[in-house]
Amino acid sequence: MTVRDVRIFGDPVLTSRADEVVDFDESLATLIDDMFDTMEDAGGVGLAANQVGVLRRVFVFDCSHVDGGLRGHVVNPVWEPIGEETQTGKEGCLSIPDVSAETTRYETVKLSGQDRDGNPIGLVASGLLSRCIQHETDHLDGVLFLKRLDPAERKAAMGVIRASDWFNK
């Protein structure tokens, strides 16, 4: 398995919509394994395929450090909110180093998709896992969490980005 480079803010792949996965083959299994290694190496709780430069609809997550939390992957994810209750909390992104901001997400979502073999999977998630599902699916739609911020938070986040060493290389 391999730790891949995480694409950083400004890379066009991060604002591109990922393609539905139709081939459940060894290359998909390798991608998922590499994504787990990459996420763990970077210290993240989630990673979407386009964050490693691959436009395929798959993400991995690890919320196992939270009571009852899960670790897994989802191919071709689709989610819908359960109820209207929301949660607001600090959110960051491996593709936008040093930036975190208060972001509002649905508290509980129903997720469906497939596993690496094409088998259907589904779950209901709340809290951190719900936030992770929404964040990673946004990535697969080419949407960064900055777009979910209110204008003042977005302006502050962009100021941090513009002042960052990684942005000014």
From Swiss-Prot:
Signal peptide: none annotated. Its EC number is 3.5.1.88. Its cofactor is Fe(2+). GO terms for molecular function: metal ion binding; peptide deformylase activity. It is an enzyme of class 3 (hydrolase). The active site is at E136. Binds 1 Fe(2+) ion. Keywords: Hydrolase, Iron, Metal-binding, Protein biosynthesis. One of its GO terms (biological process) is co-translational protein modification. Fe cation binds at C93, H135, H139. It catalyses: N-terminal N-formyl-L-methionyl-[peptide] + H2O = N-terminal L-methionyl-[peptide] + formate. Belongs to the polypeptide deformylase family. Removes the formyl group from the N-terminal Met of newly synthesized proteins. Requires at least a dipeptide for an efficient rate of reaction. N-terminal L-methionine is a prerequisite for activity but the enzyme has broad specificity at other positions. This is Peptide deformylase 1. It comes from Corynebacterium efficiens (strain DSM 44549 / YS-314 / AJ 12310 / JCM 11189 / NBRC 100395).
